[in-house]
Amino acid sequence: MRLRVATYNIHKCRGLDRRVRPQRIIEVLREINADIIALQEVLSIAGQSREKDQAQFIAEEIGMTHIVGGTRMLKGGVYGNVVLSRFPLLDTHNYDITVLGREQRGCLRADVEIAPDRALHIFNVHLGTAYLERRHQGRKLIDEAILSNRDLKGARIMLGDFNEWTRGLATRLLASHLVSADVRVHLPRAKTYPGVLPFLHLDHIYFEDSLDLEGMVLHRSRVALIASDHLPLVADFRVK
């Protein structure tokens, strides 16, 4: 079977024009038409307006199941990572990878049932902005409790905003355990941040070799160039 996944830091739906417009993010996601989507920097305040209850509004509008992994508690809700899926969710877990004294960070795992008795494990990550912080977080991600968890029998995909624009320790550690869908190899225009004139490659996708990468797209539609300060990164896989 073929599977399309995407990672997208939506910057709380705040575009480069500084306007909060969830509808623009929805338009971008419809253009991408992915089966599984990892979002970062999402507000989820239940019962509030679409500008504040972004996770629920986006999921309902595009008709996908969703799960929220909060990294920061807010009054009446959370801020953090979200996984959207066309497939049923079997289980989820939110890992705290915060480094003391730094901004709260997390890794949201979603176990997705892509076929009867067949799961795919999605890890949605948003790492810190400091080098030493990311080094600690990279080591934590490959710990047995997260990426190396032997209780997880399906293929793994780890994707998100890694805040590393060069081959730092975190990305090298992950590349030693997973295959890197390196946009510098697959795409001529590889930068994902900031949106209109991107010059940094912050967003990455890693996967197990039981999956075949068939193609990658850095989605650069007119609305995507303004909807967030990141561009969405999309990968097409064939599941063996």
PLM regions and their residue ranges:
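Active-site regions of metal-assisted phosphoester/phosphodiester hydrolases
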Residues: 1-36, 60-61, 65-240
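Active-site neighborhood of divalent metal-dependent phosphoester/pyrophosphate hydrolases
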Residues: 13, 40-47
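Short active-site-adjacent helix-start/loop capping segments
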Residues: 45-48, 75-77
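Extended active-site neighborhood of metal-dependent phosphoesterases/phosphodiesterases
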Residues: 57
